[in-house]
Amino acid sequence: EEVEMKEKKQQKSKKKKGWDPLSLTVLLIALCVFVFSAYQLAMMMVPYYTGGEEYDEIKNLAIVSDKIGEGVEEAPKFQVDFDKLMQENPDTVAWLRFDQPSIISYPVVKSADNNEYLTKTFSANDNKLGAIFMDMRNQNDFSDRNTFIYGHNMKVGGEMFSQLNEYASEDFYKAHPYFYIYTPDGKTRTYEVFSARVVKDSAEV
């Protein structure tokens, strides 16, 4: 009898160790959800990576000198090869650069349609990063009283105009109040940030 009891206990323990159909189904569903979520995340990150790589290549192509000037109000002494930029994209009108956040250093384009560069990079590739572009109503030579330049506030990666959020800090503003516009005619325009605020994309400008 003792032997029979031991055999029954062993059989029960073996049954407990196995996967029942319900548990196996739940596990497979969870695994599928995980794989799908990982795939979606990877697909979401690809544009940030490819777009970032593209703009790094453009910087390597176009910036021929990158020395910082002396004095707070002196523009960085670096030169942009606008001939190469024009060959890559004839819509080029300028180069925009901040000392800090230093990541904001991009070519500026202009199109007859403000929607064109919302999802198209400087090199005309479809990408959610888009490009930094001037309002179609402005003059290319920045002779207007107000010139509007647009760029995306990317939630991941910090590309394009995302880092402008740093100006929410008064200390950051005081430390880095200037930015610079370089144009194909060889001029460098120095601007001082006097106001920064967050508005909806539907706000009138």
Where do the protein language model's features map onto the residues?
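N-terminal Lys/Arg-rich, disordered targeting/topogenic segments
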Residues: 1-19
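N-terminal Sec-pathway targeting helices
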Residues: 13-31
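Solvent-exposed, non-transmembrane regions of membrane-associated and secreted proteins
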Residues: 31-205
